């Protein structure tokens, strides 16, 4: 059962700094963005680690106890699936590098694997990707005026349905 979903935005990139639409262009984090995700990753990892410790302190019966034949058994599945972990955590991210950098800042601290999924990519801005708003206005003023209709790109609702 899923009891919590947390979505994070990646840290800053050079395109963010230049106010460019990056969409699905694979731009890595800049040094500030890496610092941002390191801070966020540490805070999240601390939150989940201490939440787990507190749950186990309140409910010590949740700690998996080996049965009498444990020393002779080689099947570890029952212990891997035991509730001692408190909750099963899954870290999923877009396949874009900036998103992977962000996910790993959290997951690596807790020793969790990161699963990449292209469907989690940012919204597509079509041919406007990599351009600033001023550049878009200069070459496509009429199209820019219809920005709210997202002509030539993916709508916000398209992103929501993918996520």
Residue ranges and their predicted role:
Residues 11:
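Active-site metal-binding loops of divalent metal-dependent hydrolases
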Residues 5, 17-20, 27, 120, ...:
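N-terminal hydrophobic or amphipathic segments with adjacent small-residue motifs
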């Amino acid at each position: 059962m899923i009891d919590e979903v947390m979505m994070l935005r990646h840290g800053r990139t050079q395109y963010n700094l230049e106010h460019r639409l990056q969409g699905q262009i694979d731009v890595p984090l800049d040094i500030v963005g890496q610092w941002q995700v390191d801070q966020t990753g540490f805070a999240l990892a601390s939150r989940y680690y201490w939440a787990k410790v507190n749950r186990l302190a309140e409910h010590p019966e949740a700690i998996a106890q080996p049965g009498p034949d444990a020393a002779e058994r080689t099947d570890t599945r029952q212990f891997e699936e035991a509730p001692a972990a408190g909750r099963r955590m899954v870290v999923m991210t877009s396949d874009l590098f900036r998103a992977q950098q962000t996910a790993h800042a959290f997951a690596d601290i807790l020793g969790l694997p990161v699963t990449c999924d292209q469907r989690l990519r940012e919204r597509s801005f079509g041919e406007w990707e990599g351009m600033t708003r001023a550049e878009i206005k200069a070459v496509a003023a009429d199209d820019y005026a219809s920005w709210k209709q997202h002509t030539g790109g993916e709508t916000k609702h398209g992103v929501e349905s993918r996520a």
